[in-house]
Protein backbone atom coordinates (compact mmCIF):
# COMPACT_ATOMS: atom_id res chain seq x y z
CA UNK A 1 0.00 0.00 0.00
CA UNK A 2 2.95 2.32 0.60
CA UNK A 3 3.81 2.33 -3.09
CA UNK A 4 0.14 3.25 -3.84
CA UNK A 5 0.35 6.23 -1.51
CA UNK A 6 3.54 7.29 -3.24
CA UNK A 7 1.83 7.18 -6.62
CA UNK A 8 -1.11 9.20 -5.28
CA UNK A 9 1.17 11.85 -3.82
CA UNK A 10 3.14 12.05 -7.07
CA UNK A 11 -0.04 12.46 -9.13
CA UNK A 12 -1.40 15.17 -6.80
CA UNK A 13 1.95 16.99 -6.84
CA UNK A 14 2.15 16.88 -10.63
CA UNK A 15 -1.41 18.16 -10.95
CA UNK A 16 -0.75 20.97 -8.47
CA UNK A 17 2.42 21.98 -10.33
CA UNK A 18 0.55 21.96 -13.64
CA UNK A 19 -2.21 24.12 -12.19
CA UNK A 20 0.27 26.63 -10.77
CA UNK A 21 2.17 26.80 -14.06
CA UNK A 22 -1.07 27.50 -15.93
CA UNK A 23 -1.93 30.24 -13.44
CA UNK A 24 1.48 31.83 -13.88
CA UNK A 25 1.16 31.78 -17.67
CA UNK A 26 -2.19 33.59 -17.54
CA UNK A 27 -1.57 37.34 -17.16
CA UNK A 28 -3.57 39.19 -14.54
CA UNK A 29 -6.17 41.52 -16.03
CA UNK A 30 -4.50 44.84 -16.88
CA UNK A 31 -1.02 43.33 -16.62
CA UNK A 32 1.22 43.53 -19.69
CA UNK A 33 2.93 40.19 -20.42
CA UNK A 34 6.73 40.24 -20.21
CA UNK A 35 7.80 40.08 -23.85
CA UNK A 36 11.44 39.60 -24.73
CA UNK A 37 12.70 42.59 -26.71
CA UNK A 38 15.67 42.79 -29.04
CA UNK A 39 18.77 44.65 -27.91
CA UNK A 40 21.71 46.42 -29.46
CA UNK A 41 25.28 45.12 -29.19
CA UNK A 42 25.80 47.05 -25.94
CA UNK A 43 22.68 45.58 -24.34
CA UNK A 44 20.37 48.59 -24.68
CA UNK A 45 16.80 48.12 -25.97
CA UNK A 46 16.73 48.26 -29.77
CA UNK A 47 14.46 51.19 -30.66
CA UNK A 48 15.48 51.32 -34.32
CA UNK A 49 12.58 51.52 -36.73
CA UNK A 50 9.75 53.65 -38.04
CA UNK A 51 7.13 54.55 -35.44
CA UNK A 52 3.86 56.46 -35.43
CA UNK A 53 1.22 57.67 -32.98
CA UNK A 54 -2.33 56.68 -33.91
CA UNK A 55 -4.45 58.94 -31.70
CA UNK A 56 -5.91 62.44 -32.00
CA UNK A 57 -3.42 64.39 -29.86
CA UNK A 58 -2.33 66.23 -33.00
CA UNK A 59 -5.72 67.99 -33.08
CA UNK A 60 -6.17 68.47 -29.33
CA UNK A 61 -4.29 66.99 -26.37
CA UNK A 62 -7.43 67.06 -24.22
CA UNK A 63 -10.89 65.52 -24.56
CA UNK A 64 -12.64 67.03 -27.59
CA UNK A 65 -15.72 66.42 -29.71
CA UNK A 66 -15.83 66.12 -33.48
CA UNK A 67 -16.33 69.41 -35.29
CA UNK A 68 -16.10 70.98 -38.69
CA UNK A 69 -12.89 72.61 -39.81
CA UNK A 70 -12.17 76.35 -40.07
CA UNK A 71 -11.81 76.42 -43.87
CA UNK A 72 -15.26 75.92 -45.35
CA UNK A 73 -14.00 75.16 -48.87
CA UNK A 74 -12.06 72.13 -47.58
CA UNK A 75 -15.18 70.49 -46.15
CA UNK A 76 -14.47 67.28 -44.24
CA UNK A 77 -10.80 67.40 -45.23
CA UNK A 78 -10.01 69.82 -42.42
CA UNK A 79 -12.58 68.47 -39.93
CA UNK A 80 -11.50 67.59 -36.39
CA UNK A 81 -12.13 63.98 -35.25
CA UNK A 82 -13.36 63.35 -31.72
CA UNK A 83 -10.72 62.17 -29.29
CA UNK A 84 -9.87 61.38 -25.69
CA UNK A 85 -7.30 63.18 -23.60
CA UNK A 86 -3.65 62.11 -23.38
CA UNK A 87 -3.09 64.68 -20.60
CA UNK A 88 -2.81 63.33 -17.08
CA UNK A 89 -6.05 64.36 -15.35
CA UNK A 90 -7.21 66.05 -18.60
CA UNK A 91 -6.02 69.39 -17.19
CA UNK A 92 -3.35 71.72 -18.58
CA UNK A 93 -2.44 74.04 -15.66
CA UNK A 94 -2.23 77.41 -17.39
CA UNK A 95 -1.61 80.63 -15.53
CA UNK A 96 -4.67 82.95 -15.93
CA UNK A 97 -3.11 85.15 -18.63
CA UNK A 98 -1.94 82.06 -20.53
CA UNK A 99 -5.40 80.46 -20.42
CA UNK A 100 -6.78 83.57 -22.14
CA UNK A 101 -3.99 83.40 -24.72
CA UNK A 102 -4.74 79.74 -25.40
CA UNK A 103 -8.40 80.61 -26.05
CA UNK A 104 -7.34 83.31 -28.53
CA UNK A 105 -5.04 80.85 -30.26
CA UNK A 106 -7.89 78.36 -30.60
CA UNK A 107 -10.20 80.95 -32.12
CA UNK A 108 -7.50 82.14 -34.54
CA UNK A 109 -5.93 78.78 -35.34
CA UNK A 110 -5.55 79.25 -39.08
CA UNK A 111 -3.59 82.47 -38.79
CA UNK A 112 -1.51 81.55 -35.72
CA UNK A 113 -0.63 77.85 -35.73
CA UNK A 114 3.01 77.41 -36.86
CA UNK A 115 1.99 74.12 -38.52
CA UNK A 116 -0.22 75.99 -40.97
CA UNK A 117 2.87 77.83 -42.19
CA UNK A 118 4.93 74.61 -42.36
CA UNK A 119 7.33 75.70 -39.65
CA UNK A 120 9.18 73.01 -37.69
CA UNK A 121 6.77 71.40 -35.19
CA UNK A 122 8.92 71.34 -32.05
CA UNK A 123 8.96 68.71 -29.31
CA UNK A 124 6.87 66.82 -28.32
CA UNK A 125 4.43 67.72 -31.13
CA UNK A 126 6.61 66.19 -33.85
CA UNK A 127 6.16 62.77 -32.22
CA UNK A 128 2.36 62.54 -32.38
CA UNK A 129 1.57 64.29 -35.66
CA UNK A 130 -0.17 62.03 -38.21
CA UNK A 131 3.16 61.29 -39.89
CA UNK A 132 5.74 58.61 -39.05
CA UNK A 133 9.18 59.21 -37.60
CA UNK A 134 12.30 57.07 -37.56
CA UNK A 135 14.68 56.25 -34.70
CA UNK A 136 18.28 55.36 -35.55
CA UNK A 137 20.69 54.31 -32.80
CA UNK A 138 24.24 55.02 -33.95
CA UNK A 139 27.53 53.24 -33.22
CA UNK A 140 28.68 56.11 -30.96
CA UNK A 141 25.49 55.82 -28.84
CA UNK A 142 23.96 59.10 -30.07
CA UNK A 143 20.42 58.73 -31.41
CA UNK A 144 18.93 60.33 -34.52
CA UNK A 145 15.21 60.95 -34.77
CA UNK A 146 14.00 61.90 -38.25
CA UNK A 147 10.42 63.07 -38.83
CA UNK A 148 8.47 62.93 -42.07
CA UNK A 149 6.67 66.19 -41.26
CA UNK A 150 8.69 69.14 -42.59
CA UNK A 151 11.68 66.77 -42.93
CA UNK A 152 12.49 67.71 -39.32
CA UNK A 153 15.20 65.93 -37.34
CA UNK A 154 17.10 66.05 -34.08
CA UNK A 155 20.20 64.37 -32.67
CA UNK A 156 19.96 63.15 -29.09
CA UNK A 157 23.40 63.43 -27.53
CA UNK A 158 24.04 60.67 -25.01
CA UNK A 159 26.91 62.56 -23.37
CA UNK A 160 26.83 65.77 -21.35
CA UNK A 161 26.52 68.84 -23.58
CA UNK A 162 27.08 72.55 -23.20
CA UNK A 163 24.03 74.83 -22.79
CA UNK A 164 22.36 75.55 -26.15
CA UNK A 165 23.96 78.61 -27.79
CA UNK A 166 20.67 79.80 -29.33
CA UNK A 167 16.98 78.96 -29.05
CA UNK A 168 15.63 76.78 -31.87
CA UNK A 169 12.40 75.20 -33.08
CA UNK A 170 13.41 71.64 -32.10
CA UNK A 171 15.51 72.52 -29.05
CA UNK A 172 18.64 70.73 -27.85
CA UNK A 173 18.17 67.12 -26.72
CA UNK A 174 20.33 65.16 -24.29
CA UNK A 175 19.63 61.50 -23.51
CA UNK A 176 20.39 58.86 -20.92
CA UNK A 177 19.22 55.35 -20.10
CA UNK A 178 17.16 54.69 -16.97
CA UNK A 179 17.20 50.90 -16.99
CA UNK A 180 15.45 49.97 -20.25
CA UNK A 181 13.86 53.42 -20.67
CA UNK A 182 15.37 56.10 -22.91
CA UNK A 183 15.03 59.45 -21.12
CA UNK A 184 15.45 62.58 -23.26
CA UNK A 185 15.72 66.10 -21.82
CA UNK A 186 15.17 68.93 -24.30
CA UNK A 187 15.66 72.65 -23.65
CA UNK A 188 16.67 75.66 -25.72
CA UNK A 189 13.34 76.14 -27.51
CA UNK A 190 12.07 79.31 -29.08
CA UNK A 191 8.49 80.31 -28.24
CA UNK A 192 7.10 79.76 -31.74
CA UNK A 193 5.76 76.18 -31.59
CA UNK A 194 2.48 74.79 -30.29
CA UNK A 195 1.57 71.44 -28.75
CA UNK A 196 -1.49 70.85 -30.98
CA UNK A 197 -4.06 72.52 -33.25
CA UNK A 198 -6.13 73.61 -30.24
CA UNK A 199 -3.80 76.50 -29.44
CA UNK A 200 -1.87 74.96 -26.54
CA UNK A 201 1.43 76.83 -26.39
CA UNK A 202 4.58 77.52 -24.36
CA UNK A 203 7.37 80.06 -23.87
CA UNK A 204 11.11 79.87 -24.49
CA UNK A 205 11.46 78.50 -20.93
CA UNK A 206 9.99 75.15 -22.01
CA UNK A 207 11.69 72.01 -20.65
CA UNK A 208 10.50 68.69 -22.08
CA UNK A 209 11.38 65.31 -20.55
CA UNK A 210 10.47 62.32 -22.72
CA UNK A 211 10.51 58.66 -21.68
CA UNK A 212 10.55 55.97 -24.39
CA UNK A 213 9.97 52.45 -23.03
CA UNK A 214 9.76 49.46 -25.35
CA UNK A 215 6.86 47.26 -24.22
CA UNK A 216 6.94 44.73 -27.06
CA UNK A 217 8.60 44.32 -30.47
CA UNK A 218 6.07 46.71 -32.01
CA UNK A 219 5.02 49.01 -29.14
CA UNK A 220 6.65 51.93 -27.32
CA UNK A 221 5.22 53.63 -24.24
CA UNK A 222 5.72 57.39 -24.66
CA UNK A 223 5.49 59.60 -21.57
CA UNK A 224 6.27 63.33 -21.54
CA UNK A 225 6.67 65.77 -18.66
CA UNK A 226 6.23 69.42 -19.66
CA UNK A 227 7.61 72.26 -17.53
CA UNK A 228 7.39 75.98 -18.27
CA UNK A 229 7.20 78.29 -15.23
CA UNK A 230 6.39 81.28 -17.43
CA UNK A 231 3.17 79.70 -18.75
CA UNK A 232 2.07 76.88 -16.42
CA UNK A 233 1.52 76.73 -12.66
CA UNK A 234 3.12 73.28 -12.36
CA UNK A 235 4.63 70.50 -14.49
CA UNK A 236 2.14 68.28 -16.35
CA UNK A 237 2.27 65.02 -18.29
CA UNK A 238 1.02 63.41 -21.45
CA UNK A 239 1.19 59.71 -22.31
CA UNK A 240 0.39 57.60 -25.35
CA UNK A 241 1.48 54.46 -27.22
CA UNK A 242 3.68 54.59 -30.32
CA UNK A 243 3.38 51.78 -32.87
CA UNK A 244 6.01 50.34 -35.19
CA UNK A 245 5.03 50.60 -38.85
CA UNK A 246 4.62 47.08 -40.21
CA UNK A 247 4.54 47.95 -43.91
CA UNK A 248 7.03 45.76 -45.75
CA UNK A 249 8.46 48.81 -47.52
CA UNK A 250 7.93 51.36 -44.72
CA UNK A 251 10.03 54.49 -45.11
CA UNK A 252 9.82 58.23 -44.55
CA UNK A 253 8.53 60.01 -47.63
CA UNK A 254 9.11 63.51 -48.97
CA UNK A 255 7.13 66.34 -47.43
CA UNK A 256 5.79 69.40 -49.23
CA UNK A 257 3.57 72.20 -47.94
CA UNK A 258 0.29 72.65 -49.77
CA UNK A 259 0.11 75.69 -51.99
CA UNK A 260 -2.45 77.75 -50.07
CA UNK A 261 0.08 78.10 -47.23
CA UNK A 262 2.15 80.32 -49.48
CA UNK A 263 -0.92 82.49 -50.07
CA UNK A 264 -1.51 82.72 -46.32
CA UNK A 265 2.07 83.74 -45.61
CA UNK A 266 2.85 85.99 -48.55
CA UNK A 267 -0.50 86.81 -50.15
CA UNK A 268 -0.43 90.34 -48.75
CA UNK A 269 2.63 91.03 -50.92
CA UNK A 270 0.86 90.05 -54.15
CA UNK A 271 -0.41 92.86 -56.36
CA UNK A 272 -4.10 93.34 -55.65
CA UNK A 273 -6.76 93.67 -58.36
CA UNK A 274 -9.62 94.58 -56.05
CA UNK A 275 -11.52 91.32 -56.59
CA UNK A 276 -9.82 89.20 -53.93
CA UNK A 277 -11.41 88.33 -50.61
CA UNK A 278 -9.09 88.29 -47.60
CA UNK A 279 -8.18 84.63 -47.08
CA UNK A 280 -8.46 84.46 -43.31
CA UNK A 281 -11.44 86.77 -42.91
CA UNK A 282 -13.66 85.47 -45.73
CA UNK A 283 -13.17 81.75 -45.46
CA UNK A 284 -12.55 80.89 -41.85
CA UNK A 285 -14.95 80.19 -39.03
CA UNK A 286 -15.19 77.98 -35.96
CA UNK A 287 -18.55 76.50 -34.97
Model-derived segments and their meaning:
Residues 2-287:
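PEST-like low-complexity, intrinsically disordered acidic/proline/serine-rich tracts
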